[in-house]
Amino acid sequence: MSIGDVCSARFIFVTGGVVSSLGKGLAAASIGALLQARGFRVRLRKLDPYLNVDPGTMSPAQHGEVFVTDDGGETDLDLGNYERFTGVNTTKEDNITAGRIYQQLLAKERRGDYLGHTVQVIPHVTDLIISFILSNDDGADFIICEIGGTVGDIESQPFLESIRQVSYRLSKNFTIFVHLTLVPCVGSAGELKTKPTQHSVKELSSLGIQPDIILYRSAEPLPQYQSAKIANFCNVSADNVIPALDVESMYKLPVMYHAHKLDTQILSHFGMGAPEPDLTKWANVLTMVNNARNVVTIAIIGKYTKFLDAYTSLTEALDHAGMHSGIKIQVKWVDSRLPVRESDLHDVDGVLIPGGFGDDGVDGKVLAIGYARANGIPMLGICMGMQLAAIEFALNVAKLEDANSTEFNQACKNPIVVELPWLQKGEGEYLLGGSMRLGSCTYRLSADSRVASVYGSTVINERCRHRYCINPQYKNVLEEHGLSFTGMSDSHGLVEVLELQSHPWFIGVQFHPEFKSSPFAPHPLFTSFVQNVLQIKQRGFMHKSVSAAAILVPGSSVVS
């Protein structure tokens, strides 16, 4: 049976050269959005050459955020861009890594599936990669596959060989190669250099892949003679040398790529006709971005503030809420690993505490939560941010001595936060990767709560990624002191939402709402947060009379 017998979709393979982090994921997402706007069904996938099974245990400082899918996949952040640009939910099967391929390969070898054969990279590894590429097309007209890394990386070679084989077996009528490269600007004269692109294409061609379209990343379009030079020496049509220009907003990319006929050239390659794309919604987004008049400053207190890819979905969700509310969001990044001073918080209009792991930077986050609580500053805590809000309240309001999380101190007197019951270590091997509570869950909200009003419903579905939870033994004592637990999980009875109803806007959620926000449908929790930040700022409700020095953090002595 040939590949064509099992898959009728066209394949668009997006590769990158010269350097990493050029924007392959956004280019792939933009292609998907443009084809979707012409009436086609699309599916996007990411192939990562690293040997981790998934990015779940990788440092955000190296890899960026871990994007969680509805079905519990811990995936590359590019899948978040795919979802935001196309509105098509991805799954854990849309992100494959070399580690996962080798895991499957070795399991098959141990079962005897290769009995009698010498297991090799070619054909056994490449066959598994090809199987992933072709699987579960769900009736898509186009499957867009982004290959992580850079052409020339040793670890990328099996993936590049796999897509070469797919193209050979399907024929050029069903595959197209889009290669993104860098055209650097060198010297004080600002000379644009095309030689790195030529070498990158030469490297790709040596592996049996001839790019059909070259996207060159640059601050400005190349002069015609330089564009023609790339076409000539890289063996592509001059019409297929297309700029991938720096833009102020990523949401300008589909409009820009269409203006340079990227989608037109792709369809021409396949000999397919289609109506012009309806880009009205993209134009509307850009109008909203440009028309925001009110400005608020929101402090994000985290430990990866030098690596902003760690918070991609978070900052995008803030921007979505802001653009739909006519508000420009200025983010003030505060490194929680450094001493957080009152001067870091005195000029902010809102505080956001993101998720995280480990005790590094916890005191800075707790101090910021306490300062926001005591001074009427809107505060949104997500995942660990919610857990720390409960700990801060226990220390400073309920006066519970040595209130803490067992993640940070197993021997604390008052464990406000504990490991999920079904994850607590017992006999045998303890696996860290892939063992958290992951994916979409159903939550029930108190009918009279602020958060139910925000959602307009008492039953919601959100994505989670956590190993720890609020200790139910402390629910009553914290409620007696004024903290409300207004959301519970449908299946396990866990505390999922807390709020302080005496505060202008103070909400913590165990789940990750940022994963379900889009530029066309901002998440209601972020919208409420941003709008209340502006309203409270304009009304002057924040008094900022309580000093940050008065806030107790874990390990502090409680003064009765």
From Swiss-Prot:
InterPro entries the record matches: Class_I_gatase-like, CTP_synthase, CTP_synthase_N, GATASE, GATase1_CTP_Synthase, P-loop_NTPase
Domain Glutamine amidotransferase type-1: residue ranges: 297-539
Reaction catalyzed: UTP + L-glutamine + ATP + H2O = CTP + L-glutamate + ADP + phosphate + 2 H(+); L-glutamine + H2O = L-glutamate + NH4(+); UTP + NH4(+) + ATP = CTP + ADP + phosphate + 2 H(+)
Binding site for CTP: S20, D153, I154, E155, K193, T194, K195, P196, T197, Q198, K229
Gene Ontology molecular function, alphabetical: ATP binding; CTP synthase activity; glutaminase activity; identical protein binding; metal ion binding
Binding-site positions, Mg(2+): D78, E146
Activity: how regulated: Allosterically activated by GTP, when glutamine is the substrate; GTP has no effect on the reaction when ammonia is the substrate. The allosteric effector GTP functions by stabilizing the protein conformation that binds the tetrahedral intermediate(s) formed during glutamine hydrolysis. Inhibited by the product CTP, via allosteric rather than competitive inhibition.
Active site location: C383, H512, E514
Positions of L-glutamine binding: G356, M384, G385, M386, Q387, E407, R467
Keywords: ATP-binding, Glutamine amidotransferase, Ligase, Magnesium, Metal-binding, Nucleotide-binding, Pyrimidine biosynthesis
EC nos: 6.3.4.2
Domain of life, source organism: Bacteria
Region described as Amidoligase domain: spans on this chain: 1-272
PROSITE patterns, per database record: GATASE_TYPE_1
Record's GO cellular component terms: cytosol
A GO BP entry: pyrimidine nucleobase biosynthetic process
Membrane-spanning segments: none
Pathway: Pyrimidine metabolism; CTP biosynthesis via de novo pathway; CTP from UDP: step 2/2
Binding of UTP, residues: S20, K193, T194, K195, P196, T197, Q198, K229
Family to which this protein belongs: Belongs to the CTP synthase family.
Additional facts recorded: CTPSs have evolved a hybrid strategy for distinguishing between UTP and CTP. The overlapping regions of the product feedback inhibitory and substrate sites recognize a common feature in both compounds, the triphosphate moiety. To differentiate isosteric substrate and product pyrimidine rings, an additional pocket far from the expected kinase/ligase catalytic site, specifically recognizes the cytosine and ribose portions of the product inhibitor.
Summary of the function given for this chain in its UniProt record: Catalyzes the ATP-dependent amination of UTP to CTP with either L-glutamine or ammonia as the source of nitrogen. Regulates intracellular CTP levels through interactions with the four ribonucleotide triphosphates.
HAMAP family from the UniProt entry: PyrG
Subunit structure: Homotetramer.
Protein name stated in the entry: CTP synthase
Gene: pyrG
